[in-house]
Amino acid sequence: MATTWGAAFFMLVASCVCSTVFHRDQQTWFEGVFLSSMCPINVSASTLYGIMFDAGSTGTRIHIYTFVQKIPGQLPILEGEIFESVKPGLSAFVDQPKQGAETVEELLEVAKDSVPRSHWKRTPVVLKATAGLRLLPEQKAEALLFEVREIFRKSPFLVPDDSVSIMDGSYEGILAWVTVNFLTGQLHGHSQKTVGTLDLGGASTQITFLPQFEKTLEQTPRGYLTSFEMFNSTYKLYTHSYLGFGLKAARLATLGALETEGIDGHTFRSACLPRWLEAEWIFGGVKYQYGGNKEGNEGSGEVGFEPCYAEVLRVVQGKLHQPDEVRKSSFYAFSYYYDRAADTDMIDYETGGVLKVEDFERKAREVCDNLEKFTSGSPFLCMDLSYITALLKDGFGFADSTILQLSKKVNNIETGWALGATFHLLQSLGISH
């Protein structure tokens, strides 16, 4: 099945359509991704490889894709993926950039073991950093990227220009949407029936879908719409990336840590944490002390779902655009949506499952009102589930009954933007045997 959908994915360039993507009044980074000039001509049968690093806020992941061109002159098909990851993410090495680059070097060894030596020199390697590095001061982020470039330069793989960069948030959303809808067969022929995508990272979150109503297009803020053509059809996507609204960034906002200048010696407390808890947490290279509300403290000292939800609600309420159309739409959700659902047995960790938005609220109530029982694995479980509930309902405006397909993989291929980015990479380089 993966091969079949992989073939469908690569049919994207078969039509060789001009696909300039633009915001309402300007061209943007996506211009030329699927241009006809990228269609390979007279290629011979071969096996192709592509290496894509996803440098997220909580970890660095490597995706090694194998593509096979079985018949000369035909576009290659996706045959398989190797996936590995390391923690923490590059942003945790904000003051030790060389050490951060060493984590990338460690994953490159996986690529060496996976890609035949004879293919190393023509296998491209690229790293795209996401919200974790976007949140860092520019000079700090560039120091990390420089060290990664040095690692790549010494590697035996093909290193394209701009091989190490920070990716625009909307780039994540669009490529994830394309990946999911191609792997599920939603974009075949002239069908406009697609699924939306929700990605919840550590530092940012993305929402992308194809609006079905003119009212949505008319009421959408400037910069949230992106148009492109494929299969002789025009798709105008609603897509936006919210920096600072990822799961772990939201923890800091909920705790009030983002509003505190001096954090040394300060313990941040929350109704979302058990009373007995006193701990520390490192995010983005910064150490935070945190704990539960204490009885008798200033304030209510309450714990449980209701006071917790009031805290996370302040993080999202009135800060995200709410397109009415999403209330009746279906979405694929992945990353931390998937992880927290799996952590609480709402879905199977390997196969995923289907949930309604209200299922997250029900589980959040269960966890938060029984904090002593549910915090052995993660003391933030109550806060995370409550935040996800608030993000979906009060942030994006989803209805309780909205259906979410929780998926880590589609047809055995990881969801997310990495496959789409690798596809673009191979085509833009015109790589063939």
Curated annotation (Swiss-Prot):
One of its GO terms (molecular function) is ADP phosphatase activity. The active site is at E172. The keyword Translocase does not apply. One of its GO terms (cellular component) is extracellular region. Its main location: endoplasmic reticulum. It catalyses: a ribonucleoside 5'-diphosphate + H2O = a ribonucleoside 5'-phosphate + phosphate + H(+); GDP + H2O = GMP + phosphate + H(+); UDP + H2O = UMP + phosphate + H(+); IDP + H2O = IMP + phosphate + H(+). Pfam families: GDA1_CD39 (PF01150). One of its GO terms (biological process) is 'de novo' post-translational protein folding. Its EC number is 3.6.1.6. It is found in: Endoplasmic reticulum; Secreted. N-glycosylated; high-mannose type. Glycans are attached at N232. The keyword Protein transport does not apply. Monomer; active form. Homodimer; disulfide-linked. Homodimers are enzymatically inactive. Hydrolyzes nucleoside diphosphates with a preference for GDP, IDP and UDP compared to ADP and CDP. In the lumen of the endoplasmic reticulum, hydrolyzes UDP that acts as an end-product feedback inhibitor of the UDP-Glc:glycoprotein glucosyltransferases. UMP can be transported back by an UDP-sugar antiporter to the cytosol where it is consumed to regenerate UDP-glucose. Therefore, it positively regulates protein reglucosylation by clearing UDP from the ER lumen and by promoting the regeneration of UDP-glucose. This is Ectonucleoside triphosphate diphosphohydrolase 5. The lineage of its organism: Eukaryota, Metazoa, Chordata, Craniata, Vertebrata.
